[in-house]
Amino acid sequence: MKSLFIASTMVLMAFPAFAESTTVKMYEALPTGPGKEVGTVVISEAPGGLHFKVNMEKLTPGYHGFHVHENPSCAPGEKDGKIVPALAAGGHYDPGNTHHHLGPEGDGHMGDLPRLSANADGKVSETVVAPHLKKLAEIKQRSLMVHVGGDNYSDKPEPLGGGGARFACGVIE
């Protein structure tokens, strides 16, 4: 019995805490609403910040802006008389009301994540870390967004890093 207790204790010590995680399905952001699934993002709690394990396809090769957005919706909306894909997701998650896009290491939007790099086949398979986000509960009932273009982590020369249109969106549940 004592051996069983010791063995059980050793197993439990090897896994001191099972970090919370969730999988977000990412869909094309279209003027008519969410389109076909283009991949997944597994978000998990880990030392150093939330980890975002991204597996996506159908992107253009190169860099893409990647952010947590305010609202849990990927529905289109109307802005300046035009339909905008995934507009209902709102802006970048910014609980501190900084109104600044300074990247994942900066003191701006908490939703600024490291940009993604799609290979020549338009696929992304990488894990990025959000050092300012520690708990999954902080971003539940929000959305993830991948933009068409890169992100320079600045509001100049274009606002919000110049990432351009919304390419893919998923709701964090």
From Swiss-Prot:
Residues given in the record as Cu cation binding sites: 67, 69, 92, 147
Cofactor requirement: Cu cation; Zn(2+)
UniProt KW keywords: Antioxidant, Copper, Disulfide bond, Metal-binding, Oxidoreductase, Periplasm, Signal, Zinc
Subcellular location: Periplasm
Binding site for Zn(2+): 92, 101, 109, 112
Paired cysteines (S-S): 74-169
Keyword Disulfide bond listed: yes
Signal sequence bounds: 1-19
SUPFAM superfamilies xref list: Cu,Zn superoxide dismutase-like (SSF49329)
Entries under InterPro entries matching the protein: SOD-like_Cu/Zn_dom_sf, SOD_Cu/Zn_/chaperone, SOD_Cu/Zn_BS, SOD_Cu_Zn_dom
GO cellular component: periplasmic space
Reactions mediated catalytically: 2 superoxide + 2 H(+) = H2O2 + O2
Enzyme Commission designation: 1.15.1.1
Cofactor comment: Binds 1 copper ion per subunit. Binds 1 zinc ion per subunit.
One matching Pfam family: Sod_Cu
Molecular function per GO: copper ion binding; superoxide dismutase activity
Family: Belongs to the Cu-Zn superoxide dismutase family.
Known role: Destroys radicals which are normally produced within the cells and which are toxic to biological systems.
Subunit-level organization: Homodimer.
UniProt-recorded name of the protein: Superoxide dismutase [Cu-Zn]
Organism the protein comes from: Brucella abortus biovar 1 (strain 9-941)
